[in-house]
Regions:
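A short, glycine/small-residue-rich beta-strand->loop->alpha-helix junction that serves as a flexible
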Residues: 35-46
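Short, glycine/polar-rich helix-capping loops at beta-to-alpha or helix-loop-helix junctions
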Residues: 60-72
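Conserved N-proximal alpha/beta basic substrate-recognition cap immediately N-terminal to
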Residues: 70-170, 176-177, 194
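Glycine-rich phosphate-binding loop of ATP-grasp-fold ATP-dependent ligases
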Residues: 164-166, 186-231, 258-260, 280-292
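Phosphate-binding site of ATP-dependent enzymes
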Residues: 213, 219-281, 294-299, 322, ...
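A long amphipathic alpha-helix within ATP-dependent nucleotide-binding catalytic cores
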Residues: 244-247, 284-326
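ATP-dependent carboxylate-activation loops
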Residues: 337-353
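Peripheral (often C-terminal) accessory segments that flank ATP-dependent C-N-forming ligase machineries
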Residues: 354-439
Length: 439
């Protein structure tokens, strides 16, 4: 791999890799996808490998220091700037000229939607950019609702999908008024949040006011600095400088198991989906770390209805609660971007990434005969006993890690070493103590 800094016009290019990825589907023409991320999450590298193995040429827009810039299955990377994200997007798209754009986090998905909105259709270049975004993500008229939790819940109800009633609130009076109707426990959520952040479960009236204050102060300087030091993440600084206050909503708490669906879709039709039940996660509302592949007709039907009414394309995900009384699936969140289980094989032996790649290639999706769905709990990358032998993951035997990818093994090891640094542990300990005092 040639790992040097080059400049192509106004684009900051992080690396160029001329080595062909191993284990990919051979073809004389491989559609190109531009994978974009605002964060240094190792899961994005796992997604890149799956896209490459499905027969796609993968380029990436990512922050400096991301593992995407040094793996052989990503052919080229461009520098993402947290303080000028739209310029980063526009320049990388122009330089890459991809067949499809795949956002891997809510931040870049929202920025793509904003770029579409702010780009005037006045010339051929602008028209091409807008067409590519719409081609990659689906009907642009629905973009504004993607980040409104109350809006998505209302749309779900209209489509006949079970979902807790979600109401926007703006002050303490509205908060306590809604609590009188909903009862306890209740869930407060902020629009635009993801990964379990911006969510608070409140059990008593005494917890309500501090939780409301914490979520409305989501973009304070202290939080931005904490994210920069702990996670090397500068993405909160721009909202902090803009003094952005998120819209809050409230819904009743649903008792049951968490589940989600990773989906590939095209112009409002589902190509493939994989449904999983969450066995373990980072904190109560955080991303799943251990899942089990399941077949759930209620989830599958809900996904088909939502994809159709939103007229979606590309990769996306839906989060559900499986009711503890009857197992029915209730929608609690929508993720307008690729999610971390989209490379898994479903109970029907379909795979979202493979199906999307086949659609781009104009071929039917073909799953290798020797592959079969996991029968038990799967520890998702980058977690697992090989990297954290003393953790609770040691009791699981199924690990989401290709045996022929030493690059991903190295990335996972680096992730756990970084997570266990003394300074990071100290900040997280202080953060937990502060949260306990606030809530």
């Amino acid at each position: 791999m040639v790992a040097n800094s080059q400049h192509a016009g106004s684009v900051d290019m992080l690396s160029v890799n001329n080595l062909a990825p191993s284990g990919t589907i051979a073809d004389s023409w491989a559609p190109k996808v531009l994978l974009i991320t605002a964060y240094r999450w190792p899961t994005t590298s796992r997604l890149a490998l799956a896209l490459s193995e499905a027969g796609l040429t993968v380029e990436a827009l990512c922050p400096v220091g991301h593992s995407l810039a040094r793996v052989k299955f990503v052919s080229k990377t461009y520098r993402y700037g947290a303080l000028s994200p739209l310029r980063s997007l526009r320049n990388a798209i122009a330089a890459s000229n991809p067949d499809l754009i795949i956002p891997s986090d809510d931040t870049t998905a929202a920025q793509l939607h904003e770029l579409y909105k702010l780009t005037d259709a006045t010339d051929s270049v602008s028209n091409k950019l807008r067409s590519l975004i719409a081609h990659s993500l689906g009907d642009p008229t629905n973009y504004p609702i993607f980040y409104s939790r109350a809006g998505i819940a209302s749309l779900a109800h209209a489509a006949g999908v079970l979902s807790p009633t979600t109401t926007n609130i703006h002050n303490h009076d509205e908060l306590f008024s809604q609590l009188e109707n909903i009862g306890f426990p209740a869930v407060l959520k902020s629009d635009g949040s993801f990964g379990g952040m911006g969510v608070a479960i409140i059990h008593t009236r005494a917890e309500a006011k501090p939780a409301f204050g914490k979520l409305t102060a989501y973009n304070k300087v202290a939080r931005a600095l904490s994210r920069l030091i702990v996670d090397r993440d500068a993405n909160l600084f721009l909202p902090c400088l803009r003094r952005t206050r998120p819209q809050l909503s409230i819904q009743r708490f649903l008792f049951g198991k968490r589940a989600n669906a990773a989906v590939a879709c095209w112009k409002g039709a589902v190509l493939a989906q994989v449904c999983v039940e969450v066995i373990a996660s980072n904190e109560a509302t955080g991303p799943a770390t251990v899942v089990t592949v399941i077949a759930h007709p209620g989830i599958s039907q809900a996904v088909e209805r939502l994809v159709r009414v939103l007229n979606l394309s590309g990769l996306c995900g839906f989060d559900f609660i499986l009711d503890s009384t009857d197992g029915s699936a209730h929608l609690i969140d929508f993720n307008p971007r690729a999610t971390q289980t989209c490379h898994l094989l479903s109970s029907e032996r379909t795979q979202p990434v493979l199906s999307l790649a086949a659609k781009l290639r104009g071929l039917p999706p073909i799953v290798d005969d020797h592959l079969s769905p996991h029968c038990g709990p799967i520890v998702l990358f980058p977690h697992g006993p090989a990297y954290a032998p003393k953790s609770h993951y040691s009791k699981y035997t199924e690990i989401d890690l290709p045996s022929d990818s030493p690059e991903l093994v190295k990335i996972a090891l680096e992730y756990h070493r970084r997570k266990n640094r003394f300074l990071v542990k100290a900040f997280r300990f202080a953060k937990r103590n502060h949260t306990d005092r606030v809530e």
